[in-house]
């Protein structure tokens, strides 16, 4: 339960100030993740040796596999999240698939294999014409009804259609066709429980839009039960997952101690205390071991950004927010005295964090990056300030006005910028200049974040007092129902996904490693806001997701 406003010291001298209170529920995890028990060194060494041997075994099979067997192995490696061990081999294999047509044999010229090939190539940025799917249509230009008996093929086509771009009507038709029939099959006709489970999950969460690490964890239970599974790959995944999970636990322990020492949850009780959920969010952006520093930096950044959001959205008065915005704009400790006490507490912590980040990354010669991160946070604060003024003035902007600001307050430009702070030298000054140029892929990611957030959270926000969301703005401007607005927004979200997919096609403006952060940020939103605001209101699904990635190891 939130501490009453009257207990915050800065308000005692000013008398009672009427403030909103969102009554956010407290942190549900307590100190669970603070205490980290390191892996036994001997076991750790044995696991590393075993992983190297298994990698060699999988690599040999990847290099010798051909045709559909090769595609299935590539797919399994990626869906189990161990692709980062085989980046060069996977890229060479897919280049070969792209440049050489493997489909002379009729046994491999079927719905499943063609859809799989299409998806794997599209996911790696290779343009493959969707016209290859025309062979599965009848004389009336509809997908053949006979396809509905091929459930693995239908599922493969469904997943393959999601990396589509604008103008590919056949992929939209494929999603509609497969969705309709797979729903019916899952309910009425599938006697194979494993296949039924795959279908139900895919309909709820398409692979292309899922959080990679969650999909890795889920897929092992399916893959290891397949008769044709690769035994070395299964063993590699289990050892690798547990080893990486141990690293994640260590990181979260370090971040949790930092958070507890700041004590912002007690000092600023009006704000959401969601550090564990923040870390889960960032695992969605990058889970691989080489991004350890980047994960720790980005988790701390998103946690501070969440409090800034609540200062503007929930607690600050117009006068205080003017001072706060000015202080962030100036980014100078001398601004501290002009702020009320609760803002001083936060402002000092914010400046300390960025000083800490700069000191850490200066060791690698990356000090220049912090300037961009600060600028992104300043832009975010300005956007929050604009929205707070709309609320206090009872102003409902047009959709055009709203989205101009809302793409900023989605936080995704700030998070994208900050996601590069701790990455290696593939990130350059030009990378940050690219972000600040407002590329289509980042605008699309922000659109997905903003519209999905607004659709799922606007009722709660309006009840406790909040600036008009996209839902209210659209209803006011166009005179339509909430149901019609949501339908329109989901269409816009679908279009934004096509924008992201388009920018992934080679040749790309920036390296794929950079683009992957933007894609993964959009994926996290799709998962966290699937059934509601899973960040603000931590429910059963979020608890299970956190447990699967940060608590429960894989039985070996």
From Swiss-Prot:
Out of the domains of life, which is the source? Answer: Eukaryota
Q: In which pathway does it act?
A: Secondary metabolite biosynthesis; terpenoid biosynthesis
Query: Does the entry feature the keyword Secreted, yes or no?
Result: no
The short motif DDXXD motif is annotated over 309-313
Q: Kindly list the biological process annotations in GO that this record carries.
A: diterpenoid biosynthetic process; sesquiterpene biosynthetic process
The yes or no answer to whether the keyword Nuclease is present is no
Question: What GO molecular function terms would the record report?
Answer: beta-elemene synthase activity; magnesium ion binding; sesquiterpene synthase activity
Enzyme class (EC, first level)? lyase
Task: Give me the reactions it catalyses.
Answer: (2E,6E)-farnesyl diphosphate = alpha-humulene + diphosphate; (2E,6E)-farnesyl diphosphate = alpha-selinene + diphosphate; (2E,6E)-farnesyl diphosphate = delta-cadinene + diphosphate; (2E,6E)-farnesyl diphosphate = (1S,2S,4R)-beta-elemene + diphosphate
What SUPFAM superfamilies does its record include? Terpenoid cyclases/Protein prenyltransferases (SSF48239), Terpenoid synthases (SSF48576)
Q: How is the cofactor bound?
A: Binds 3 Mg(2+) or Mn(2+) ions per subunit.
Gene3D superfamilies with a match to the protein in the record? Farnesyl Diphosphate Synthase (1.10.600.10), Terpene synthase, N-terminal domain (1.50.10.130)
Q: Which family does it belong to?
A: Belongs to the terpene synthase family. Tpsa subfamily.
Q: What is this protein called?
A: Sesquiterpene synthase 2
According to its UniProt entry, this protein's organism is: Toona sinensis
- This protein's encoding gene: TPS2
């Amino acid at each position: 339960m939130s501490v009453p406003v009257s207990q915050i010291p800065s308000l005692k001298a000013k008398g009672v100030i009427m403030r909103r209170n969102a009554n956010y529920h407290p942190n549900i995890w307590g100190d669970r993740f603070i205490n980290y028990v390191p892996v036994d060194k001997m076991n750790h060494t044995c696991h590393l040796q075993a992983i190297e041997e298994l990698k060699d075994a999988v690599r040999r099979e990847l290099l010798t596999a051909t045709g559909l067997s090769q595609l299935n192995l590539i797919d399994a490696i990626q869906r189990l999240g161990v692709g980062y061990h085989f980046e060069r081999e996977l890229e060479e294999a897919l280049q070969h698939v792209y440049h050489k047509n493997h489909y002379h044999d009729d046994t491999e010229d079927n719905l499943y294999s063609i859809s799989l090939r299409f998806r794997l190539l599209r996911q790696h940025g290779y343009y493959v014409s969707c016209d290859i799917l025309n062979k599965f249509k009848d004389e009336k230009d509809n997908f053949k009804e006979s396809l509905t008996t091929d459930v693995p093929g239908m599922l493969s086509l469904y997943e393959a259609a999601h990396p589509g771009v604008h103008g590919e009507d056949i992929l939209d038709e494929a999603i509609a066709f497969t969705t309709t029939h797979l729903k019916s099959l899952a309910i009425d006709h599938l006697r194979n429980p494993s296949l039924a489970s795959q279908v139900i999950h895919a309909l709820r969460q398409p692979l292309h839009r899922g959080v990679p690490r969650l999909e890795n964890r889920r897929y092992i239970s399916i893959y290891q039960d397949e008769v044709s599974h690769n035994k070395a790959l299964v063993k590699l995944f289990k050892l690798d997952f547990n080893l990486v999970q141990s690293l994640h636990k260590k990181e979260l322990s370090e971040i949790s101690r930092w958070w507890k020492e700041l004590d912002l949850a007690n000092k600023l009780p009006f704000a959401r205390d969601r550090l564990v959920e923040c870390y889960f969010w960032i695992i969605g952006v990058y889970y691989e071991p080489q991004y350890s520093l980047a994960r720790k930096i980005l988790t701390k950044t998103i946690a501070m950004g969440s409090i800034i959001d609540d200062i503007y959205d929930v607690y600050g008065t117009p006068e205080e927010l003017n001072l706060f915005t000015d202080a962030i704009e100036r980014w100078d400790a001398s601004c501290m005295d002009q702020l009320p006490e609760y803002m001083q507490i936060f402002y000092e912590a914010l400046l300390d964090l960025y000083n800490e980040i700069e000191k850490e990354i200066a060791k690698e010669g990356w000090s220049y990056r912090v300037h961009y991160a600060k600028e992104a946070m300043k832009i975010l604060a300005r956007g929050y300030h604009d929205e707070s003024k709309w609320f206090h003035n009872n102003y409902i902007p047009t959709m055009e006005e709203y989205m101009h600001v809302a793409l900023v307050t989605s936080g995704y430009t700030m998070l994208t910028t900050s996601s590069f702070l701790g990455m290696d030298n593939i990130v350059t000054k030009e990378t940050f200049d690219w972000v600040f140029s407002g590329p289509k892929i980042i605008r699309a990611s922000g659109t997905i974040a903003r519209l999905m957030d607004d659709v799922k959270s606007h009722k709660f926000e309006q009840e406790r007092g909040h600036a008009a969301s996209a839902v209210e703005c659209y209803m006011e401007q166009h005179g339509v129902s909430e149901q019609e607005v949501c339908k329109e927004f989901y269409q816009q979200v679908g279009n934004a996904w096509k924008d992201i997919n388009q920018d992934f096609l080679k040749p790309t403006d920036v390296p794929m490693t950079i683009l992957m952060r933007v894609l993964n940020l959009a994926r996290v939103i799709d998962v966290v806001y699937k059934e509601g605001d899973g960040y603000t209101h931590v429910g059963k699904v979020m608890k299970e997701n956190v447990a699967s990635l940060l608590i429960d190891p894989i039985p070996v």
